Curated annotation (Swiss-Prot):
Chain's gene name: Tdp2
Record key words, sorted: Acetylation, Cytoplasm, DNA damage, DNA repair, Hydrolase, Isopeptide bond, Magnesium, Metal-binding, Nuclease, Nucleus, Phosphoprotein, Ubl conjugation
Modification after translation (UniProt): Ubiquitinated by TRAF6.
EC number: 3.1.4.-
Location of Phosphothreonine modifications: T95
UniProt subcellular location: Nucleus; Nucleus, PML body; Nucleus, Nucleolus; Cytoplasm
A GO CC term assigned to this protein in UniProt: nucleolus
Protein name listed in UniProt: Tyrosyl-DNA phosphodiesterase 2
Domain of life, per lineage: Eukaryota
Compositional bias ranges of the Low complexity kind: 1-22
Region span, Disordered: 1-30
Record-annotated site: Interaction with 5' end of substrate DNA: Y184, W303, F321, H355
Cross-link annotation Glycyl lysine isopeptide (Lys-Gly) (interchain with G-Cter in SUMO2), location: K30
GO biological process: double-strand break repair; neuron development
Length: 366
């Protein structure tokens, strides 16, 4: 069951000197990134250009759009298309061949049948595709983690089209199912020969302001039926009410699966513990993997601006945004370990994402 006291206390103490300012800074960064994405989608420009117009117009979208469309066509100082060196998700071709790129996943395409092992593993990770800075190197960093850990399933959030194309080319031993094809979206990767795809469903969140939904994928693992789910719930404290409604939808969908189906949800929930309490807590038959394992401190915070400076937020904020929920017949699925990944800086000096990834291993008891 969800326990709010310890996490709430930790959140209220971060940072101790000025919690209000820290939260405002955090929300502002996320809001502006989403605002830049929306501007880019409307204007078909790069998000770096979008951010420039918005910042020069005090982040007033209508004013920025007017400035963009009213600029002279020969104004070379403000190209609609970024220069070829721009590190933008819309224009950096992540699929280009690179002779030095060793991140192609070359494990056996047939995989190892689950019947030979009672352990499954998966990664859940918000890979921050909306950040165009150093995107090719960060994408290679993510693929390096996939190659290193070779999980059976990967749950991803904040995937963009060019990033998805890169994954399809580099992660050849995985089938990739996405929650959308435009803007930014979620994806679930299934190891070929190990996880058999049976079907998918996308559940819309009707009141989302951020293009969010719930991606459900039905699979077979060693003869056992699984329903795998991922989502990127509404961001920032301002949208707490919508986030709680989305969480209720997740729990409702988890309950709809047949009793013999094991359900795993893993994703970026953006949750604060008090919101789980406001939602009524976890259903009696749904468990939080981190809590099940005794709330290990080493993997508590998946979004930590003090340890991870990708966003360059001055204040220190840390949250357990990325969570894993599971529902299984009693004793049939037992979490064994949970660890953070993506903790090492890349050559560019940044991390693969502003979120740490979670690597989870579980025992399947037949």
């Amino acid at each position: 069951m969800a326990s709010g006291s310890s996490s709430d206390a930790a959140e209220s103490a971060e940072p101790a000197a000025a919690p209000a300012a820290a939260e405002t800074e955090e929300d502002q960064v996320k809001r502006r990134r989403l605002q830049s994405l929306g501007f880019a989608l409307v204007t078909s420009c790069d998000t770096t250009v979008a951010s420039t117009f918005l910042s020069e117009n005090n982040w007033q979208t209508k004013k920025a759009l007017s400035a963009f469309f009213e600029q002279p066509e020969n104004d070379l100082a403000r190209p609609h298309q970024p220069p070829t060196s721009s590190k933008s998700e819309d224009y950096v071709d992540l699929t280009n061949e690179d002779a030095n790129d060793t991140t192609i996943l070359e494990t056996s395409p047939s995989g190892t049948p689950l019947e030979d092992s009672s352990t499954i593993s998966f990664i859940t990770w918000n890979i921050d595709g909306l950040d165009g800075c150093n995107l090719p190197e960060r994408a290679r960093g993510v693929c390096s983690c996939l190659a290193l850990y070779s999980p059976d399933v990967v749950f991803l959030q904040e995937v963009i089209p060019s990033y998805c194309a890169y994954l399809r080319k580099r992660a050849r031993t995985y089938n990739i199912i996405t929650g959308n094809e435009e803007g930014y979206f979620t994806a679930i990767l299934l190891k070929k020969g190990r996880v058999k795809f049976k079907g998918q469903e996308i559940i819309p969140f009707p009141n989302t302001k951020m293009m969010r939904n719930l991606l459900c994928v039905n699979v077979s693992l060693g003869g056992n039926e699984f329903c795998l789910m991922t989502s990127h719930l509404e961001s920032t404290r301002k949208h707490s009410a919508e986030r709680i409604n989305q969480l209720k939808t997740v729990f409702q969908k988890m309950q709809e699966a047949t009793d013999s189906t094991t359900v795993i949800f893993a994703g970026d929930t953006n949750l604060r513990d008090q919101e789980v309490i406001k939602c009524g807590g976890l259903p009696d038959n749904v468990f939080d993997a981190w809590e099940f394992l005794g709330k290990p401190k080493h993997c508590r915070y998946t979004w930590d601006t003090k340890a991870n400076d990708n966003l360059r937020i001055p204040a220190a904020c840390k949250h357990r945004f990325d969570r894993i929920f599971f529902r299984a017949e009693e004793g049939h699925l037992i979490p064994q370990s949970l660890d953070l990944i993506g903790l090492e800086r890349l050559d560019c000096g940044r991390f693969p994402s502003d979120h740490w990834g979670l690597l989870c291993t579980l025992n399947v008891v037949l």
